[in-house]
Curated annotation (Swiss-Prot):
EC number: 2.1.1.77
Originating organism: Alcanivorax borkumensis (strain ATCC 700651 / DSM 11573 / NCIMB 13689 / SK2)
Gene name tied to this protein: pcm
Annotated protein name in UniProt: Protein-L-isoaspartate O-methyltransferase
HAMAP family: PIMT
Compartments, as annotated in UniProt: Cytoplasm
Cytoplasm keyword on record: yes
UniProt GO cellular component terms: cytoplasm
Length: 220
């Protein structure tokens, strides 16, 4: 995906370049990920009233008690997910507004994304189609169950926090695959990476983060 935007203010190349430099200074090293952040128009994924903050490195509300993750978190999770090589098939839990989905799309052949809140999924679908990302498969469902019909996945990214990792997601991770998600309660969460080797799962905890909680059921 290469979306060229021009102009001044919130959508200018200079504004987006400043964000990329902040992410680089904050430790994001993969230039492919930085390019994806630069080329993904974040202002399209938030309310117009907040558009002046679109390229700040901060989380923003998107309604229904949910947020669009700060760009550093999106970049970091993407960087971790592709560190072992390009995954062919990826599952995302928590489509939200679709921003993380759009950043992920260039790095895999097949992308499946589950969202439990119907209005958010509908908006994400429109935005992704607007960006030419028709290949992304979206599903309105409880993310705790993953997407059994399309499993296994080479990589799984969850954009919501739980105190543990759902067994349903681990079982859908392919041998040699990687899962990235925040783990913890309301007060403390850490970005966690799980690598599968046969029936063994090796995990490592990395950065402190703050995500909305993993919730069950669906909302229409």
């Amino acid at each position: 995906m290469d979306i060229q935007l021009s102009g001044i203010g919130m959508t200018s190349a200079r504004t987006r370049d400043r964000l990329v430099q902040r992410l680089r200074d904050a430790g994001i090293q993969d230039e492919r990920v930085l390019d994806a952040i630069r080329n993904t128009p974040r202002h399209l994924f938030i309310e117009e009233a907040l558009a002046h903050q679109a390229y700040d490195d901060t989380a923003l509300p998107i309604g229904h008690g949910q947020t669009i993750s700060q760009p550093w978190v999106v970049a970091r999770m993407t960087e971790l997910l592709i560190a072992k090589g390009k995954p062919r098939k990826v599952l995302e839990i928590g489509t939200g507004c679709g921003y993380q989905t759009a950043v992920l799309a260039p790095f895999c052949d097949e992308l499946y994304s589950v969202e439990r809140i119907r209005p958010l999924q509908d908006l994400a679908r429109k935005r992704l189609l607007q960006l030419g990302l028709a290949k992304v498969q979206l599903k309105h469902a409880d993310g705790g169950f993953g997407w059994t019909a399309e499993a296994p996945f080479d990589a799984i990214l969850a954009a919501c926090a739980r105190v543990d990792i759902p067994e349903g997601l681990l079982s859908q991770l392919a041998d040699g695959g990687r899962l990235v998600m925040p783990v913890g309660g309301d007060r403390q969460q850490v970005l966690t990476v799980v690598d599968r080797d046969g029936d063994q799962f090796r995990s490592q905890t990395l950065d402190s983060v703050r995500f909305v909680p993993f919730q069950r059921g669906v909302l229409r």
